[in-house]
């Protein structure tokens, strides 16, 4: 269990108290809440950049810790509504510097990884950072069979899905058997978006029959 003083320090961003506790007992930093959260998870959720950097310097293993929902501190930072993407970007750099690719690629209980969450949360720049740092994030699908590309197209994030299209083995599937091309049409995305996806259809979307008549794309789903 987590020391209550450490819990309070993580929630409030009191790095001085955290360091005091760790000085007397370094193992105190490994304590968790009943939900499996470490002090790094908690400080990430609350957006305490300084606390996070200080505690990571004392115990780097916290970066790879997952809670009961299999969320890493990186995912906690991405999904928290209280924080900017600055902290998540800082986490990402730390993961890369320490060669923690496995932790970056971690999928939570719902099958979502940090890229799924970044796109769904509207963090487009962070999504592009994640893709550049770890292209393999593009291969994962969640429990609803949604790929990062599918979610990006549903959100009409052209810059994100175009970057994903540059990755040869990036997955494109979505829920109920749909794919990113289906999503573009169903979502009423711009003709430009559909045209871009069409260029890759022969490689990625073989289950979708496509015909071109003039400037109109016709899609036959089965």
Q: What does each model-found stretch correspond to?
A:
Residues 33-36, 40-117, 121, 131:
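Eukaryotic helix-linker segments that join adjacent hydrophobic helices
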Residues 1-51:
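N-terminal segments that cap or nucleate solenoid repeat domains
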Residues 2, 36, 70, 111, ...:
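Start-of-repeat signature of ankyrin repeats
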